[in-house]
Structure formats: structure tokens, C-alpha cells
């Protein structure tokens, strides 16, 4: 059995297919952990979701911000941006089934045997493993509700919830979890989430911001953290215990696969379309 973690696919299905062929991925015995943002930007979001859903128990995804945004488009609380290339997916006859499958997925997963924790954007520095999984579970339960659109999706679009407090309750707590686990890159010096800066770490630091993984005193100990979301990193964090897997395939760069057992990375360049 082999365990693979893949970075932001974002509808780059052909590249995913070639990458998995390189490692002879066998869903009957191997596992594919997906770091979120399975859809949008690339042209094959429909094929990507159908394939991942079809892997059944062999796939272990977490949700990214684009996956949650797809739910908002499906629920008609947001308008479609043509740049997202989601037309075929939104018109698919099995869209409802694909959305229902997405709604079952968490925002964070733990591989206990190897002490690995995965979330799309990263882990707030105040949270330990227990807190991450507990707060992720609350969002997962909210997404499983019949009224999940009105209860959560329609209300999650806000930058005003940027500060963690254990006393925060209800919707605000759910929104903080979504913002932290699917949108976070930089923090302000007081620990608040910054939603505007998407620059590489060195440039953001010149503006007084702190990459979330450089915040002193992080509560997470003893786990390797796997994340995507931040294409400007191009997989380079130069810090032990971190695996950054978003390498900008949908922007013309490449898709990255991390083989857990050997600690090796395999990549596939963006394919040129004929």
C-alpha cells in the first residue's frame, strides 16, 4: 500500500491522470489524499470530481475555498465567474450527486499512523490537533444539514471573522474555521487572519505580515502539516514538518504528488493543449 498526497488540482484532470500513472497508483490498495481546491480555473473540473468520487474509500479529500464556492454557485447564492471554467460541471446531470459527495468531506484530516495532518490552507497557530479536528467536524456537520446553503454557505463570505477565541459560538465560530482552514496565508502580528496578501512570504513580511507557519509558539507539535492553497510558495517552505503542495498547475506550472512512505515528491508539468 502506498499513500499519496496531491496538491491543488483545480480541474487539471489530464495532469492528475498522467501523474498517477507515473506512480502506478492502484486504488484497490493505495490511498490518494487530496489537499482541496479540486475544482475551478482548470478546464476539467467535472472529470476531476467524477474521478475522485469514483475512487470511493481510496480517496481522502479535504475541502478548499473553491470547493466551498462551488456549493455557493450550486445554491445560487453567488454568480458564476467565467474564469473559473465551471460551466460543464454546473450543467452536468450528476451535479447534485457530486455536490452531495463534496458535502461529506471535512476541512481537515489526520493520518494517525504517520502523524500527518492535512488542511487546505494551513492550521491556525493557536490550534492543536484535537482542536483542528473538532472544529473541522463542526463545519462538516453543518454542511451535512438539509439547509446547509441557508445555514452556512450563504453566510460564510465575510472578512470580519479573522480572530480566534475559544468563547466564540455558533455561525461566527464556523466561519472562522472556514476562513482559517481554507483561506489563510498571512497573519497580522496579533494573530488575526489577513485575507488580502497573496505574495510570497518574503514580500508579505516586508509589509509587516507573518506567514501562518512562521508564527512563534504554534500549538501544533509532533505532526507533519500538509497544505496547498498558496501557489506563490511553489512548494518551498524550508521548514521541517511542513509539506506545501500547491505548485500552480492551473497557472501553467505543475502538479505535485507527495509519496508519504518514501518522502519523495513527483511532479507533472502543465500539459499543452493541442
UniProtKB/Swiss-Prot annotation:
InterPro entries membership: ApaH (IPR004617), Calcineurin-like_PHP_ApaH (IPR004843), Metallo-depent_PP-like (IPR029052)
Matches recorded under Pfam families: Metallophos
Superkingdom of this protein's organism: Bacteria
Gene3D superfamilies recorded: 3.60.21.10
Molecular function (Gene Ontology), one example: bis(5'-nucleosyl)-tetraphosphatase (symmetrical) activity
EC number: 3.6.1.41
EC main group: hydrolase
Keyword terms, alphabetized: Hydrolase
Similarity section: Belongs to the Ap4A hydrolase family.
Function: Hydrolyzes diadenosine 5',5'''-P1,P4-tetraphosphate to yield ADP.
Protein name according to UniProt: Bis(5'-nucleosyl)-tetraphosphatase, symmetrical
Organism name: Shewanella loihica (strain ATCC BAA-1088 / PV-4)
